[in-house]
C-alpha cells in the first residue's frame, strides 16, 4: 500500500496538540492499515524515526437530518511516538 494512502490526514485538536510535547502525533489512517505499515509510512513521508504506534478504531456518530437518521463513517486513529530529537514540522504553529 502507498504511504500516502495509509496516512489520510493529521488530527489537530487541543488534546493532540498537548500530546506533541511528549513527541506524540495523531493521524487518521486507513482502516485496514497495520501498525508496521503505519510506522513505515510515517518514516517514509516525514523522514523521522518512530518508536511506538498505538491505534484505535473510532465508531461513527449518530447524526440526524430532518427525520432521517444515519451514522458518520467509522475510522481509525493512530498515535505515533517519535524518537528523541525528531519532530514533524507540519504541526508547528497549529
From Swiss-Prot:
This is Large ribosomal subunit protein uL23. Pfam families: Ribosomal_L23. Part of the 50S ribosomal subunit. Contacts protein L29, and trigger factor when it is bound to the ribosome. One of its GO terms (cellular component) is ribonucleoprotein complex. One of the early assembly proteins it binds 23S rRNA. One of the proteins that surrounds the polypeptide exit tunnel on the outside of the ribosome. Forms the main docking site for trigger factor binding to the ribosome. Keywords: Ribonucleoprotein, Ribosomal protein, RNA-binding, rRNA-binding. It comes from the Bacteria. HAMAP family: Ribosomal_uL23_B. GO terms for biological process: translation. GO terms for molecular function: rRNA binding; structural constituent of ribosome. Belongs to the universal ribosomal protein uL23 family. The keyword tRNA processing does not apply. InterPro entries: Nucleotide-bd_a/b_plait_sf, Ribosomal_uL23-like, Ribosomal_uL23/eL15/eS24_sf, Ribosomal_uL23_CS. It comes from Roseiflexus sp. (strain RS-1).
Amino acid at each position: 500500500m502507498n504511504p500516502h494512502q495509509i496516512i489520510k490526514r493529521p488530527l489537530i485538536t487541543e488534546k493532540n496538540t498537548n500530546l506533541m510535547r511528549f513527541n506524540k502525533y495523531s493521524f487518521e489512517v486507513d482502516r485496514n492499515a497495520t501498525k508496521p505499515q503505519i510506522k513505515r509510512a510515517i518514516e517514509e513521508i516525514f523522514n523521522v524515526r518512530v518508536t511506538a504506534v498505538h491505534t484505535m478504531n473510532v465508531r461513527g456518530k449518530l447524526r440526524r437530518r430532518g427525520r432521517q437518521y444515519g451514522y458518520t463513517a467509522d475510522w481509525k486513529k493512530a498515535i505515533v511516538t517519535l524518537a528523541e530529537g525528531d519532530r514533524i514540522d507540519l504541526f508547528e504553529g497549529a
